[in-house]
Amino acid sequence: MSVFTEIFSHCKRMFFRLKEAFPQYHILAQVAFSALITNSNLKIRARFNRKVTDFVLLDKNLKVIMIVELDDPSHIGKEVEDAQRDAMLYEAGYRVKRYTEIPSIETLKKDIH
């Protein structure tokens, strides 16, 4: 199995875990920061221009409940970059939760509610 296939499979399992834990929410995968954050200043927009978040949970009114990041081994050594990404999302008013492994349904419910 290639590294790409392994990472994709890991994300796919997380998607279905989120769907199982939160059937009342819409789960979006691979959402561009530009769909979540707006700014007319080009310099500021350039900071998040090509960034993508793993999962966004939306309620029935399409309000963002939580942003979920699933950090695979490629994130090792990128803690500062991840913290900066999280800070951008927090500053925009979003809650962010990071996992290094696919959590149990109970953990997800505890963390996200």
Where are the regions that the model predicts?
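Active-site-adjacent loop/helix micro-motif of nuclease/hydrolase catalytic cores
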Residues: 48, 75-82
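Conserved catalytic cores of phosphodiester-cleaving nucleases, focusing on short active-site segments
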Residues: 18, 55-57, 66-70, 89
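Active-site metal-binding core of divalent-cation-utilizing nuclease and nuclease-like domains
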Residues: 29-63
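Short coil/turn motifs at secondary-structure junctions
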Residues: 60, 73-75
